[in-house]
Amino acid sequence: MRQQHEITTSAPLLGKDGNLLEPGWARSLLPVYRRADIKASPMRIKEWDYYLITDGHIGLALTIADNGYMGLDSISFLHFDENWEQTTSRMRALPLGKTKLPESSADGASEIAKGGYAMAFYHEDGARKLSFHMDKFRGKDAIEGIVQLTDEPDESMVIATPFDKPGHFYYNQKINCMRAEGWIELGDRRFELTKDKFFAVLDWGRGVWTYHNTWYWGSASGELDGVPFGWNIGYGFGNTAAATENVLFYGGKIHKLGEVKFEIPVDEDGFEEFMKPWVFTSDDNRFYMNFTPVLDRSAFMSAGVVLSDQHQVFGRFTGRITLDDGTVLPVRDFFGFAEKVENKW
């Protein structure tokens, strides 16, 4: 297992040349992101806020993204017990930063309101508030709701990853194990979210990406024997020589992992079979999981030079993890997801 560089002091994320000053990982947003420091074309800058809330029976995902040449605002509702999901997205041409997403996840508001839909992610009274509405979300049915996120852990996964191309980077924070409460109305159905059962993750991303990428990402949040617990795992893009994004969350603290491998089954022709059991292993032997899928939120889009092929697979993990102090904890039927996404963007 190779050594990973932990960032421990606050400093600007980017130098005068637009490159990362200090690649590595951190436990909070120590590197300071300023959009004005980026030297790339506004067409190439990608900024997004993504929230996922679930109790393992239903799920809600909300996205506001400004990808330079294209804005993407998306709502997903997933019903794992009934084995269906609905994702409806609205695209905006050439936002070029006009969405004005905050330069930190710790303050500010991410908001969008267009014909037939609106979303707002903001801070109020020490909590994160998510409000959303979309007409004709599923057929003629609208969706709307308000969700409050609390109990944010002391530490989060933060990583500054360079690409080998100058001026290209990805700055990312994952805040797992937040508790969620609120309500969702979809058509004539109402779903109550209670903080003893629902957990949330924030995927906060800012950067300049190269054109063609494939990434693997997995995440889970919940409780293990009454202790807030989860993980973030992933790889596939950028130069990760300084650090990986693989961590365990336990009791509000991070336990750093080495490299994690996603073993997705394939058929005799080499095509991936996403709904068959997966296996996850790590080079430090601290993360071993068998994954049983229950629902594949798949999406494919190809338009000219733009392509997105997504498989976000939800299911249950069984295996074991090892904390920094050597404590081995068994994990059984722990709900989360793992995905493979290819983008040309």
Q: Which residues make up each language-model segment?
A:
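Structured soluble/peripheral alpha/beta segments that form catalytic or ligand/cofactor-binding pockets
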Residues: 1-345
